A protein has these predicted regions:
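Non-catalytic substrate-recognition and accessory regions of acyl/acetyltransferase enzymes
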Residues: 1-133, 147-174, 179-180, 187-212
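Glycine-rich acyl-CoA binding loop
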Residues: 134-145
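Residues that cap or flank secondary-structure elements
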Residues: 137, 182-183
Length: 212
């Protein structure tokens, strides 16, 4: 019989400390429903949640050349991972940047963005999808977006410092278009959400936010 409590605390501790080595090597498996009578239901659910979260995070770490994540507690008191990742080797004119909240469930909250430069760095928000309705992850992502972008800017600055190939300008402007994921949020509610976090929205649902 597995000591679920100690394993849960072990996984949570290594997520909070951003222990990449642990996450890559972790091989815990979810416990199937047929064994649920052995364990308390809520503890089993929590254990399986963190096993799934680490598996998903591990996949992103393995598939990215530059990834950072931070943990937050959601409204269900579960740890979630706020992730930003990109592949510097795939840059052409623009750089694709993946920003998401990874949870120990099926669907992430996901923001597909593109970095490009004019007088300053600009981040264009192409897609913004939340995995399910009323879970608070869309608000969490937007609430932490400035922090995530500051981290991205620091990483881009490091590339400038270590290679003459790059001359990235810091991201100071956010642009994009508010396109709702119809099964989750309406256009009106999505616009209200963006407005709450400092975005200006025109009549065609185009977004603009200056970070200066």
């Amino acid at each position: 019989m597995i000591d679920l409590e100690s394993r849960i605390e072990e996984m949570k501790s290594n997520l909070v400390s951003k222990n990449f080595r642990y996450i890559i090597k972790c091989k815990y498996k979810t416990i199937p429903a047929k064994e649920k009578d052995i364990y308390k239901e809520e503890k089993l659910k929590e254990y399986n949640y963190y096993v799934k979260l680490i598996k998903k995070l591990k996949k992103h770490i393995k598939n990215s050349s530059d990834i950072q994540f931070y943990t937050k507690y959601d409204k269900f008191n579960n740890l979630v991972c706020l992730v930003s990742k990109f592949d510097i080797n795939e840059i052409d004119i623009n750089l694709n940047i993946d920003i998401r909240i990874i949870i120990g469930d099926k669907y992430d909250t996901y923001m597909k963005t593109t970095y490009y430069q004019e007088k300053c760095g600009i981040l264009y928000l192409e897609e913004f999808e939340s995995g399910s309705r009323n879970n608070g992850y869309g608000s969490m992502l937007l609430d932490n977006l400035n922090f995530i972008i500051d981290n991205i800017n620091n990483r881009l600055k490091n590339y400038n410092n270590y290679s003459e190939t790059y001359n990235f300008k810091p991201i100071k402007i956010l642009k994009g278009r508010a396109i709702p994921f119809k099964s989750v949020i309406s256009q009106e509610d999505l616009n209200k959400l963006y407005t709450k976090y400092g975005f200006k929205i025109d009549n065609n649902n185009y977004l603009l936010k200056n970070r200066e």
